[in-house]
Amino acid sequence: MMCLECASAAAGGAEEEEADAERRRRRRGAQRGAGGSGCCGARGAGGAGVSAAGDEVQTLSGSVRRAPTGPPGTPGTPGCAATAKGPGAQQPKPASLGRGRGAAAAILSLGNVLNYLDRYTVAGVLLDIQQHFGVKDRGAGLLQSVFICSFMVAAPIFGYLGDRFNRKVILSCGIFFWSAVTFSSSFIPQQYFWLLVLSRGLVGIGEASYSTIAPTIIGDLFTKNTRTLMLSVFYFAIPLGSGLGYITGSSVKQAAGDWHWALRVSPVLGMITGTLILILVPATKRGHADQLGDQLKARTSWLRDMKALIRNRSYVFSSLATSAVSFATGALGMWIPLYLHRAQVVQKTAETCNSPPCGAKDSLIFGAITCFTGFLGVVTGAGATRWCRLKTQRADPLVCAVGMLGSAIFICLIFVAAKSSIVGAYICIFVGETLLFSNWAITADILMYVVIPTRRATAVALQSFTSHLLGDAGSPYLIGFISDLIRQSTKDSPLWEFLSLGYALMLCPFVVVLGGMFFLATALFFVSDRARAEQQVNQLAMPPASVKV
């Protein structure tokens, strides 16, 4: 009896082991079926065919949603790679682009640094340009306004092209173009100021291609918090490049003894960067990081895309808020170094410059502050947003709103402190810029969340057009115009040169407060607009495939 019981137990144990082995084989077959390359040929035990029971895709926010069922596919088709089976199936992951993603993001960020370095090199030698060409504040402000006007007109065109053609080729051609124009502008004779104005307009066209398309490539390389981090690095290039523009302009002018040489640095670096983009940046598929690969193309007309964007309330309000940021940064970036120089003339700590080369100290200090506050602001904004996302789904626009409203207070204090203390003015600039710069990367991330991949380049272009049209396209000229208008009604003196420019710049904090209100309005609609974008992505995805072997 004991032997029978032992044999029975052994047989039962063998049967249980065989059953366990059978279950393990089935699980392995199911897991192979869920994988990218094995889904079409996955087999269960005994050669039974395995068919896909469901399909899932990753959404814009990183969550996983079930895609709609569709007609069967055939072996080897792209749709087969998305098939998942059973409760033990692995979640799909975006196809890897390898280590080149980080290098590509770094090169794109470097290009953004050069764009803004070139843009603000002119501001770094603005006083020399005024003395060389004999223009007043209004004429000096025209340089930046013409640049921005051409920039905003070209941006929608490049947005359309960026959603439909090879993006890295467009980027490189844009860099090569503005580099050539900037280098040529350094040889313009003294009597042809209008040629310098025209050249800045042409540079704006070249730089529009970059600012419109580059963020969408980064958006297609990364997702979720990684995308926020990479966009933070990319948009840190704005204050970094702006600060380096002031520093480069003033330093090269001092070293060469001629401000024209300041315009010959960025073109050389631009040619190198454009070549690196052609060689090292991958030709990324639109929607790649959103688990869509080849599945998304620009299927809708440009007019339909525009209508959809205008109806997107989060996009509209965040674009208006971005316009307020552009207004303030454009005006302050253009005029603050000159304003602080005039403040020191009034305080008898500096002399009025009557012929170039003029002093470079204020541009150097302001450039260094802009670089550091840009880094601090972008890091602080990204970190605050990641922490607040754990508390609320509306974290992105709320962090932007707090930064804007806080910045307005310290921008106001700049003009109070500058009357008696330059150090106090620099402290207010430091805090105000840090808070103002905290929203750049977050605003770009808001756009990525609420706009589907096939419309992102168009969305960036339209947002760029709007922000420049309502922002820095007119703010430098407007500030110069108001300053000259006030000076015409007063006696010509260093005191009124200082006061008139300060009164004109007081317009900036009020616009910044308005921008904070627009970010609060964005928070009201952000959650629903993001959910709608995720739903549209799922509808655009190609139908899943299930194959019976």
Curated annotation (Swiss-Prot):
Pfam families named in the record: MFS_1
Keywords from the named record: Cell membrane, Deafness, Disease variant, Endosome, Lipid transport, Membrane, Non-syndromic deafness, Transmembrane, Transmembrane helix, Transport
Transmembrane segments annotated in the record for this chain: 141-161, 169-189, 202-222, 229-249, 261-281, 320-340, 364-384, 398-418, 422-442, 466-486, 507-527
Residue stretches of biased makeup (Low complexity): 77-97
Coiled-coil parts of chain: none
Lipid bilayer topology: Multi-pass membrane protein
Similarity section: Belongs to the major facilitator superfamily. Spinster (TC 2.A.1.49) family.
Function summary: Lipid transporter that specifically mediates export of sphingosine-1-phosphate (sphing-4-enine 1-phosphate, S1P) and sphinganine-1-phosphate in the lymph, thereby playing a role in lymphocyte trafficking. S1P is a bioactive signaling molecule that regulates many physiological processes important for the development and for the immune system. Regulates levels of S1P and the S1P gradient that exists between the high circulating concentrations of S1P and low tissue levels that control lymphocyte trafficking.
Catalytic activity from the UniProt record: sphing-4-enine 1-phosphate(in) = sphing-4-enine 1-phosphate(out); sphinganine 1-phosphate(in) = sphinganine 1-phosphate(out)
UniProt keyword annotation of Chloroplast present: no
Disease: Deafness, autosomal recessive, 115: A form of non-syndromic deafness characterized by severe sensorineural hearing impairment in early childhood. Sensorineural deafness results from damage to the neural receptors of the inner ear, the nerve pathways to the brain, or the area of the brain that receives sound information.
Gene Ontology, cellular component aspect: endosome membrane; membrane; plasma membrane
Region (Disordered): 14-39, 61-97
One Gene Ontology molecular-function label: transmembrane transporter activity
Compartments (UniProt record): Cell membrane; Endosome membrane
Principal cellular location given in the protein's record: membrane
Species: Homo sapiens
UniProt xrefs under SUPFAM superfamilies: MFS general substrate transporter
Protein's UniProt name: Sphingosine-1-phosphate transporter SPNS2
GO BP field: B cell homeostasis; bone development; lipid transport; lymph node development; lymphocyte migration; regulation of eye pigmentation; regulation of humoral immune response; regulation of T cell migration
